[in-house]
Amino acid sequence: MSSYMEAAAAARAAEAKTEGLLRGACALLAAAAALLVGLNTQTETVLFIRKKATVKDVQALWVLAMAAAAAAGYHLLQLLRCFYLSRFADGKPCRHRRAIAWLCFLLDKGCAYITFATTVAAAQACVVALYGTHALQWTKLCNIYTRFCEQVAGSLVCAMLAAVGTALLSVVSARNLFRLYPSMLSPPPSSFVG
């Protein structure tokens, strides 16, 4: 029986390390996206007028920078929780285990949805900046502010990878949550005589 307990403890430690690595990767990707888009500026001269492109010129990019920074902070806090559980918890039972699992599950889902939604909204705004909209007489901007648009594209890639990683983390937190509930299936009858 003790070998089973040791194997279960080793499996929990491996799961915590894997979750920690995934959370660390998501935190780095979200922080990279926030920094790439948030600190991005470019100044160009157009018809003898100096114009500066910043993240605040496009509301969707500003929202992406704030959401990515918040997601990076959230993943960092969850990474600290994973570190604590893998180092100090040692399988001790917790009275509030289900409540904490529900909270992590809901926060992971919310983070995944917000990260994905803000990334897609920023990508839509970037498509307008890339191609323009002739019906509204909006001109292309990426042929003027090339470096700015390239950095925004890099931040969109990082943010989308962070959103996919966050979706995977929400699957992990769902597994951790529903593992705390007993199975509703009845055990198979043990009438087999052998």
Swiss-Prot record:
The keyword Membrane applies. Residues 40-59, 131-151 are extracellular. It is found in: Cell membrane. GO terms for cellular component: plasma membrane. Keywords: Cell membrane, Membrane, Transmembrane, Transmembrane helix. It comes from the Eukaryota. The keyword Transmembrane helix applies. Residues 1-18, 81-109, 173-194 are cytoplasmic. It is a multi-pass membrane protein. It holds the Pfam family CASP_dom. The chain crosses the membrane at residues 19-39, 60-80, 110-130, 152-172. InterPro entries: CASP/CASPL, CASP_dom. NCBIfam families: A_tha_TIGR01569. Homodimer and heterodimers. PANTHER family: CASP-LIKE PROTEIN 2C1-RELATED, CASP-LIKE PROTEIN 4A4. Belongs to the Casparian strip membrane proteins (CASP) family. This is CASP-like protein 2C1. The lineage of its organism: Eukaryota, Viridiplantae, Streptophyta, Embryophyta, Tracheophyta.
